[in-house]
Amino acid sequence: MPTLLTPFRYVTIRHQAKLLYDVILPITLGLAVSALLLGLTKPVPIFGKEAYLGQIQGLLTILGGFSVAALTPITTDKSDMLGQPVGGLRPPRLPSERLPLSRRRFLAYLFGYLAASCFALVALSVLANLVAPQIVSEVAAGKRFWLKAAFLVPFNIWLAHVSVATLLGLFYFTERLKIANRTAKVGTPDAAPSPERS
């Protein structure tokens, strides 16, 4: 995987709960928010500084900064607690690795993904606000709604995934790290990655 896309390795982590957190909840929430914004009798303005995207930019900037700040204690703390593997009967792991992820690596991938996603979503919203006025002036009125929906639905699904992942990260910080694992340790997760044997 290219170096610049490393933060997005979080979405490749395998775990039985990933379907719920990465697919079902984000799609459900994203579609619900999009339907609300597009289906109101008086539509909510989407593009512009004071519109939906303009308001979201400020929130994403704060969330991105929080995610970067969260990486500092995760990557510098050498305590045994973060070095332990993530618990559970089927702990999360990367497709190319045999050993389960340690808590440190899992959280690093999680908050790295959040920081990168916030940066990307801010960039998308800024670009959309810049080009939307020109595109709207050149598109027939009957097609504007569908063009807006084609941008807004994927944007909101990604935003919903970031929101769900943020809550998952907060759960680990506030609760999960204090709970002892119910399964025995397997290997040394903080060691160099071990590829699966063919």
Where in this protein do the model-derived segments appear?
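Cytosolic juxtamembrane amphipathic/interface segments immediately preceding
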Residues: T6-L20, E97
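Alpha-helical transmembrane segments and their membrane-interface junctions
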Residues: L36-L37, G112-S137
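Short membrane-interface loop/juxtamembrane segments of multi-pass integral membrane proteins
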Residues: G88-L110
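Alpha-helical membrane-embedded segments
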Residues: W146-E175
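Membrane-helix interface/capping segments
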Residues: I46, L71-R93
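Long, highly hydrophobic alpha-helical transmembrane signal-anchor segments
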Residues: Q16-T61, E138-A141, L152
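Hydrophobic alpha-helical membrane-embedded segments
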Residues: Q57-S79
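Cytosolic/matrix-facing juxtamembrane and C-terminal tails of multi-pass cellular membrane proteins
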Residues: L4-V11, G169-S198
